[in-house]
Design a protein with these regions (language model features):
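Glycine-rich, acidic/polar active-site loops that bind/position phosphate-bearing ligands
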Residues: 142-326, 335-338, 345-582
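Composition- and surface-driven signal marking solvent-exposed, interaction-prone regions
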Residues: 231, 306, 328-329, 355-358, ...
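N-terminal hydrophobic targeting/anchoring segments and the immediately downstream early-domain regions
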Residues: 2-22, 139-155, 160
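C-terminal amphipathic alpha-helical interaction region
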Residues: 517-716
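Active-site-proximal loop/turn and secondary-structure-junction residues that shape catalytic pockets
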Residues: 65-69, 89-91, 119-120, 167, ...
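Flexible inter-domain linker/hinge segments
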Residues: 3-12, 18-37, 186, 190-194, ...
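Active-site core of metal-dependent hydrolases
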Residues: 28-141
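Gly-rich Lys/Arg/Thr-decorated short loops/hinges at beta-loop-alpha junctions or inter-strand turns
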Residues: 22-35, 54-56, 243-252
Length: 716
């Protein structure tokens, strides 16, 4: 019954119709954002100039300016239908938090006014002990503060004015994802400006930009509700492979189904109104998998927008009778979902990672390229730790995503450039070629300066680096703050070494410096197949780390090397870094506990009763066949019965084994607990899953208690 209900519901799904004219796009874009253009319209000129000094130059914000901004923000928000405001922040859980306060203020005579002051704008006071804090706040030390981040614009979401804020403790420690990210941006800007000054340039600031390609799955809500493992953990803990997966390679860039297209259009509409520049949408590799990519933006605002985007993706899916799955691996045997973090660095006038047509002649680019290579090699384990999570462990190294080994892919042209610098042959350069496709009706194409290597975790793609190891569900603040801090450290080393060099000697000295650094860190460059069995062996020879699980990776976050980096760049104190390690570890352990508990309970209560009862039906059929004297058919049924009985024994043994190692893990805590979960509980879960999945392929479809992969993946 379950299977037929799912199929019947899906086959009669009708896409939600909506009216939308592309001519409205430019007028609609950003209408729910208190942008700089809106500020100019609502603020007096002198107030706007003083606020602009804060936005552009980091000048302190005076209270009279805050009061004027708050009043303008309130008037604008109410005109858009907002009734409440909220300090919108990112605690260490990685998701967003908000508390809604009404603009209404009652009078003593029973009437009411609307009120929103500068103090309401710039500071809030949530309970710091109720959020993940790694021990920085005890229950009796509840006070924490949210502080307005004027560099990320306020926006209206569901009739609530959301004000992006930082979150810190009463004693000043950062308790959020945003604060250290902003610090890393400052460090990177500071050191980049020092380097650019050596080239005679004085930009106002240097800003890292990010474009995050978001992958996700869409499935029918009815099927989702019938899968308790999906509801509780975000992924299927059981499920045999579907009859057809992604092997035909027909879903990637394929025609988008009407139901999904309708969802995507509604999502675009809401994101555009929120000023989120959603640009590209398409089917991804796996069935029911899709991707949404925005235009690049300043990293702080881009991450804010990605968090809003993920929230909207889930909300709008529900309106369409769908469920949006952001877990990194909701289905076994087909691709999981990632979030490719496209990172670049620029000033108000140039992209510092643009090599130009002759990169070997572009010394400034070579310096910044060298800094990135040095940063990734020096802090490879820290970068790996920044993307570590229970969900992402299922992707990394699984021949669908980059391996857990950090390496850099530069492409043939830049690899040649690096080799020439190392060899001292700086007079020869590569230039971009022209691709002739061999047909008169097709245009000639300019060849990019890199090919694409989908197996590389950190690939140069023309004028940016694509960090492909990030998980789809993750807040990528950690990845970006680590990258920012590491590159800032490399640039600082360059500036310290080269400042004071006579102008006529600078180019030779800079190239010689790059030659030494590239020689020392050439091991991190790899252009081959990251999925191959040979690469881990080669990586070990090169001395590259291979931290396969979250439990293996997280200690790097509090290594002496990491703490020194964080403290030198001013991104995190030792206590703040320890806090983040503790929170990540605690989250991993809690998620693994939930998964193991759910798996044992589902195996006992949902799957085993059906699998145990089914042999009775087979045995009755066997007796009927025996009475009929059909020897061949009888042998077939006997084999099925034997498989079922053996399978039941295997399932029972697997449940006991998982229970035992789970109890062992529960008796521990911290890193020891994580080690047991990663290296003992997960293998035991895999064994139990394999035993149940084997029975799914034998038990009749009408008996199976939950929707199968075939039911879920092909009826949206």
């Amino acid at each position: 019954m379950t299977r037929s209900l799912v199929i019947n519901t899906a086959s009669h799904a009708v896409p939600i119709r909506r009216e939308f004219r592309m001519a409205e796009l430019t007028d609609r874009f950003g209408t729910m954002v208190f942008s700089e253009e809106v500020m100019k319209d609502y603020l007096p000129k002198d107030i706007w100039k003083r606020l602009a000094a804060t936005l552009e130059g980091g000048e302190p914000l005076d209270l009279d300016v805050a009061n004027a901004v708050a009043h303008a923000m309130k008037v604008w928000a109410i005109s858009k239908g907002a009734t409440h405001y909220a300090h919108w922040f990112q605690p260490l859980s990685g998701i967003t938090s908000e508390k809604h306060d009404s603009f209404l203020e009652p009078n003593h005579d029973g009437t009411a006014i609307t009120k929103f002051t500068g103090k309401n704008l710039i500071q809030g006071e949530p309970d710091a002990s109720s959020f993940p804090n790694g021990g920085l706040r005890a229950t009796f030390e509840a006070r924490g503060y949210t502080a307005w981040d004027p560099t990320s614009p306020a926006f209206i979401k569901d009739d609530v004015l959301c004000i992006p804020t930082a979150f810190c403790s009463y004693t000043g420690e950062a308790l959020d994802k945003k604060t250290p990210l902003l610090r890393s941006m400052s460090a990177l800007s500071r050191e980049s400006k020092r380097v650019l000054a050596l080239f005679g340039k004085t930009p106002k600031k240097v800003v890292p930009s990010v474009g995050d390609e978001q992958e996700y799955f869409l499935i029918k809500k009815d099927a989702y509700r019938k899968r308790r493992d999906l509801v509780i953990t975000g992924r299927t803990l059981f499920g045999a492979a579907p009859c057809k997966g992604q092997e035909l390679e027909e879903h990637y860039f394929g025609a988008i189904r009407p139901t999904v297209s309708s969802y995507m259009k509604d999502l675009d509409d809401e994101l555009w109104a929120l000023g989120i520049p959603a640009k590209t949408k398409h089917n991804a590799v796996a069935p029911c998998q899709h991707e949404l990519a925005p235009v690049y933006g300043e990293v702080n605002e881009a991450i804010d927008q990605n968090l809003v985007m993920m929230e909207k993706m889930k909300l709008i899916a529900s309106r369409h009778d769908l469920v949006c799955l952001l877990h990194e691996k909701p289905f076994e045997g087909i691709n999981g979902s990632g979030k490719h973090n496209n990172w670049s660095l620029g000033t108000e006038s140039e992209n510092l990672l643009d090599p130009g047509d002759t990169p070997l002649d572009n010394l400034q680019f070579i310096v910044f390229l060298t800094a990135v290579i040095e940063a990734v090699d020096n802090y490879q384990e820290l970068l790996r730790a920044s993307v570590a999570s229970a969900g992402n462990d299922h992707r990394l190294g699984a021949n669908e995503a980059p391996p857990a080994i950090m390496s850099i892919f530069l492409g043939d042209q830049l690899t040649e450039v690096v080799e020439k610098i190392i060899d001292g042959k700086a007079s020869v350069h590569a230039t971009r070629g022209v691709l002739d496709l061999g047909a008169d009706t097709l245009p000639k194409l300019m060849q990019d300066n890199t090919d694409r290597n989908r197996t590389s975790p950190f690939a140069f793609t023309g004028n940016k680096f694509e960090f492909r190891a990030c998980g789809s569900e993750q807040n990528v603040s950690d990845s970006n703050l680590v990258l920012d801090a590491a590159v800032a450290k490399s640039l600082k080393s360059f500036a310290d070494a080269l400042e004071g060099t006579p102008e006529d000697e600078f180019q030779d000295a800079a190239l010689e410096y790059c030659k030494k650094v590239l020689t020392d860190h050439q091991r991190i460059l790899f252009s081959g197949d990251g999925y191959s069995d040979e690469w881990p062996v080669e990586a070990e020879k090169r001395g590259l780390a291979n931290n396969k699980t979250t439990a293996d990776a997280l200690p790097a976050f509090v290594s002496d090397k990491a703490i020194a980096l964080f403290e030198e760049t001013g991104v995190l104190t030792k206590a703040e870094a320890q806090c983040r390690y503790d929170c990540k570890l605690e989250k991993y352990n809690k998620l693994m506990n939930i998964e193991a508990t759910t798996m044992v309970r589902e195996a006992r209560r949902t799957y085993r009763p059906v699998i145990t009862a089914y042999p009775t039906k087979v045995a009755k059929g066997l007796e009927t066949i025996r009475a009929a004297g059909a020897e061949a058919a009888m042998q077939c049924e006997q084999n099925t019965l034997n498989k079922l009985c053996n399978g039941i024994t295997t399932i029972n043994d697997s449940i006991k084994a998982l229970d035992a190692v789970h109890q062992k893990a529960e008796a521990l805590d911290g890193q020891e607990q994580a080690n047991v979960y990663a290296h003992e509980v997960v293998p035991a879960m895999d064994t139990l899953r394999a035993a149940v999945d084997a029975m799914e392929e034998i038990v009749a479809a009408d008996y199976w208690p939950v929707p199968t992969y075939d039911d879920i993946l092909f009826y949206v």
